[in-house]
Design a protein with these regions (language model features):
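N-terminal glycine-rich phosphate/pyrophosphate-binding loop and immediately adjacent elements
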Residues: 1-134, 466
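A conserved FAD-binding loop/helix module that cradles the flavin
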Residues: 51, 497-519
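A short, glycine/Asx- and small/polar-enriched loop/turn
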Residues: 89-92, 196-201, 251-258
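Active-site/ligand-binding neighborhood in enzyme catalytic cores
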Residues: 127-237, 244, 457-472
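A glycine-rich dinucleotide-binding beta-alpha-beta segment and adjacent secondary-structure elements
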Residues: 181-195, 426, 431, 435-501
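Mid-domain catalytic core of redox enzymes
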Residues: 215-218, 248-370
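Active-site-proximal substrate-binding core of FAD-dependent oxidoreductases
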Residues: 246, 252, 520-553
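C-terminal segments that line or cap access tunnels to active or ligand-binding sites in enzymes
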Residues: 322-446
Length: 553
């Protein structure tokens, strides 16, 4: 089996395939595993750009089982802050989004007694969702469930049907508009750091409930550490991975996938090909637009370019600071005035999320130093226009080998925009944390075009198809009906974020699911085991307001 891509979807696919007796070989364009789940070094600092919360990093749900099967968490400390996010208004007022519904309710009532009814309604829904998480199905795709399994799944949701129905049919933009307090009216849209205009209330409940259940913290070692742990699990299972290997074509004979051709002309033959990389590249380049039914053709030729159909890219500013900032908050979304917002190229909504990342991952920077991570959702088109048509990805020799992800020269206006964004954000941060500017040792700013260079993702998107809109819904319905395949092409499967919607746990689950489909097609019984090569993870609760650090088993 050839697997294209060593992101979490590809690594997961490889692990589960090895567990079920397949001999697999992962081909990865980059020199590292993880795809978007990555980090890079600048001097003494490691800049971790992915995991701000990891769904399923604690027990009590099926998500956790997947991470344990992949060896992602074992031997590590899971860290949980007592606040999911803080939203600071332009007037300095702040909303602390505690994930504990009782604490959240008390805080919100103090901020706006006039909104008591709506506050209690939201927190009641959150309480119900904490219990609901235990029955959410992640281990087996709905498309493989028999009639009895589907009925049993639906029956398990019966106690929560009202909260699910209400929360999935009400957009958060509409729900938040009911608040009388202007800060709450705006802040609720930014619970998940950025504004997700197409999201109903349900995913807000899902993330907060997971966080309250100690199953949405961060793992020791960070994003690249997580990816490397899964890669090690894959290798222990007997899997093979080749880096700096850029696939250019899926080889097809008699409507059967039989291997791949790399950019250097080498061919790798296989009985099965699984693509766990960018969906547009897979369908339109690797396969030349063949084997697409009407739904897939519409998705990848028109829907993908419609506003809001795929997740945007990010602008990310990292600062490595020479000293500690003990009063810093782990995670805060700042609502911006228009003067600052106008300086931030590609900005979708007038906000920026600021994390003092060394609170999450102290092991990734020297003692008594700080890493700041400031991000905003960004459209790609403005950055592409500033790039003046220059290449966004290129292959060249570096230290005796062909490398596909090295930095490129961009247009002069592109660099000017990067400097403007960097300087505007540093000024903003220095006003709130005096001395920050003078403490900067290293800095790094990336744009959606950086994402294109590193991963090849369409338009620099970080997560592919958006849920709750036509693109994601059409794709999920297609896979539920026909499996993660393309019509008319045998021995070919899709995995990773382009075969699902959502974040890292969805990518990891997609790997499990695609191997279940492969086993069904081959007449094999699917099996999966928890990795026992290291002890179970431990958990620590870190208060960002007053209170002691709590350790749990």
């Amino acid at each position: 089996m050839i697997i294209i891509g060593a992101g979490l979807g590809g690594l997961s696919t490889g692990c589960y395939a090895q567990m079920n007796g397949y001999r697999t070989h992962i081909l990865e364009m980059h020199e590292l595993p993880g795809g978007c789940c990555t980090a890079w070094d600048r001097g003494d600092f490691t800049f971790d750009c992915c995991i701000s919360w990891l769904l399923g990093n604690g027990p009590g749900n099926e998500m956790h089982r997947i991470w344990l099967e992949l060896g992602a968490l074992q031997g590590k400390q899971m860290r949980h802050f007592d606040v999911f996010n803080i939203v600071r208004g332009r007037d300095g007022r702040a909303v602390y989004f505690y994930s504990d519904p009782d604490r959240l309710e008390r805080h919100l009532l103090e901020l706006s007694p006039a909104d008591a009814r709506l506050i209690r309604d939201f927190c009641a829904g959150l309480r119900a969702f904490r219990k609901c998480l235990a029955v959410y199905p992640f281990l087996k795709p709905v498309g493989l469930m028999g009639r009895f399994e589907r009925w049993r799944m639906l029956a398990s949701f019966l106690p929560y049907v009202n909260v699910i129905r209400k929360s999935i049919t009400t957009l958060m933009t509409d729900y938040s508009a009911r608040f009388k307090d202007p800060l709450l009216r705006e802040a609720f849209n930014f619970i998940l750091y950025e504004k997700h205009a197409a999201f109903p209330v349900l995913p807000f409940y899902f993330q907060l409930a997971s966080h309250a259940n100690l199953s949405a913290g961060v793992p020791e070692g960070g994003s690249l550490g997580l990816a490397k742990s899964i890669e090690q699990r894959y290798r222990r299972l007997g899997g093979e991975v080749t880096y700096d290997a850029k696939v250019e074509e899926v080889l097809v004979e008699n409507d059967r996938a039989v291997g791949v051709r790399l950019s250097d002309g080498r061919e790798f033959r296989s009985d099965i090909v699984v693509s766990a990389c960018d969906g547009h590249t897979t369908t339109m380049r690797f396969l030349g637009g063949r084997y697409l039914n009407d739904n897939y053709r519409r998705l990848y030729t028109s829907t993908i370019d419609e506003p809001g159909m795929i997740f945007p890219g990010y602008v990310m500013l990292f600062l490595g600071l020479r000293r500690a900032f003990p009063q810093s908050e782990p995670c805060t979304t700042h609502l911006l005035d228009q003067a600052l917002a106008a300086k931030l190229t590609g900005l979708r909504h007038a906000s920026v999320n600021v994390q003092f990342r060394s609170r999450h991952y102290p092991e990734l920077s020297p003692e008594a130093t700080t890493v700041v991570y400031a991000t905003y959702f960004s459209d790609t088109a403005p950055w592409r226009a500033l790039n003046e048509g220059r290449p966004e990805q290129n292959t060249r020799r570096h230290r005796g080998r062909k490398v596909h992800t090295l930095p490129l020269r961009h247009g002069r206006d592109y660099y000017a925009a990067k400097h403007q964004v960097r300087d505007a954000l540093v000024t903003f941060l220095d006003e709130r944390y005096p001395g920050l500017r003078d403490a900067i040792a290293v800095r790094d700013l990336s744009t959606p075009l950086t994402q294109v260079r590193y991963t090849g993702n369409y338009d620099g998107t970080v997560l592919g198809w958006q849920p709750f809109v036509e693109g994601g819904e059409t794709m999920e319905e297609e896979i539920k009906k026909n499996g993660p395949t393309l019509p008319g092409l045998a021995n070919f499967y899709l995995s990773g974020v382009w075969a699902t919607t959502g974040g890292l746990i969805r990518a990891a689950a997609a790997g499990r699911h695609v191997v279940q489909f492969i086993c069904r097609d081959d007449g094999r019984e699917f099996t999966a085991d928890v990795d026992d090569s290291a002890p179970p993870p431990t958990h620590v609760i870190i208060p960002i307001t007053d209170g002691p650090v709590r350790h749990e088993g």
